[in-house]
Structure formats: structure tokens, C-alpha cells
Amino acid sequence: MNANGTSQRRLTGGLSPAWSPDGSSIAYASPGHDPNPPLSGISIMNVDGSGQHRVPNTDGGEYPSWSPDGKRIAFNSNLSGDHVMYIVIVDGSGLVDLSSVGEGWQVDWSPDGRSILFTSHRDHPDNYTDVYVMRPDGSGVKRLTHDGAYTPAWSPDGDHIVFSAPGPFIMGPDASDVSALSTPGVGETSLPDWTD
């Protein structure tokens, strides 16, 4: 659809679409044919809906996020019963298993390619989630929020992070300067993202 909401057109079924950095492709969680798992994996298509193909080695994958160079995709899969994060080259090769980090989902790759945001309830026995950041190799995990937060997204310049808690908030990449964004009349907001 257009930025103003007009000219909506269905391209395919699926969840959590993510634009490629060059704007030519969309990665998404493709629906499965069996409710267990409900998602068959990560697929990629051209922006007009053509060229749909499944990325090998992404079984049960969801929440895809492109690397800034468009060569890799970070995602999570719940096939093992835990939300395990992975990185794969777009042709399905070079799968990196980040299970050593622990559970995580709702990944978002930083514009400089050096960090990945993710959501986890690893530090909460009552299962609410917070936002964390790590390097693409799974090292340097740091918790950024402490009062429940989800759906993080980097700003295009990498200077800010937007997230829900449950309304939209913004903070610096080091978790500084947290502030609520005003959305009068909108109600509860989730899945915030940036636009250029």
C-alpha cells in the first residue's frame, strides 16, 4: 500500500514482513500447512509478490530481520520448544545457531550491522519480556529495559530504539533517555517501527 494507506494489495499469506535494505525484496514468516508448527519457515518474495521462495534451514522461522548488506537474515524459531535465534545467508547456507544466548525473538539488526536487538523473558520468572542487544555472533548480551518491553526497532541512523511497553517508547542505544511517545487517540500501540 502507499504510505497514506491507499492502494492496499494482498501479496501473500504470512507474518512479520521485513523489507530488504535495497527495497527490492520482502522476507516474511510463511504459513505452514499443519498447525504444528503453524509456520513453515522464512520466505522471500519480490515487492510485487512474484518470485516467492522458501529459505532453506529456516523451519518454524519468524520475525526475520535483514543484515544491512542484505546478505543474511536473523530470525527465531520455536521448533525445539524454545525461541532460538539464528542467522542464515539468504540462500539458506551458513546457518548460525545462537542457542547459546538463550531464548529470544523479535530480532532487529542495527543499521551498522554490529548489533541485534531481541526480546526475551530470560530474566523474568513471571514471563514478561524485556529488550536486549547482542553482537551477531551472540556475544555481548546486554539487557536494555527492566520493566517489560517488546517489539524493538532501530532508527535508520542507529541513534535510537523504539519499543512497546505497552505504548510506544524511544531510547538511546545504550538505554539512555527513555521517553514515551505521545499517540493521542490511538489506543494501545504495538509493533512500532521507523520511516525515512
Model-based region annotation:
Residues 1-196:
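Sequence signature of WD/YWTD-type beta-propeller architectures
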